[in-house]
Amino acid sequence: FLDLPTDCPQRDERLGWTGDAQVFAGTACWLADSQSFLRKFLRDVMADQRKDGAIPHFSPDPTRLHPMSDPTRPDQLARSGDWAGSTGWGDAIIIIPWQLYLHYGDKGVLAECFPAMLKWLDYLWNISDGPLIRPSSRWGSHGFTFGDWLQPVGDNRKPRPTISDECA
């Protein structure tokens, strides 16, 4: 933590990745008084929330102020609108306020974030297939998703063994 929750400084990923922040929020609150820091981060996330309710993958979102105009250039990996709306990363708007409530009894953060939470849930409902949020058969047809540990394409109806199966 410096001014924002970063991913890993050694790989030039010093953006405020929302997925990393939501995973670490509970631990951060347990290790140190992180209430003010995380509330400030949530305000950044709410300021960056898209009109359709999508939560950005990182916040403050530099693409909001300086859109990446040429996705074919190696230094511009995607159009700015593509960097929002992935589950896990967007869930930060719900998980971080909840962690602040659990650790500090802060009901104010729940009230402050509630409209953004509803917008995020509406966004998820709008991209869902009925009651389930599923990746579609085409990679990225519902917007960009990371799927860091999952195969993004293929027959997802048949479970296949993975290297981590025996770890559970």
Where are these regions (language model features)?
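Active-site acid/base region of carbohydrate-active enzymes
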Residues: D3-T72, H103-E166
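Conserved, well-structured interaction surfaces
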Residues: D75-D82
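Cofactor-binding catalytic cores of oxidoreductases
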Residues: S86
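Short, solvent-exposed loop/beta-turn-alpha elements that line the ligand-binding surface or hinge
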Residues: Q99
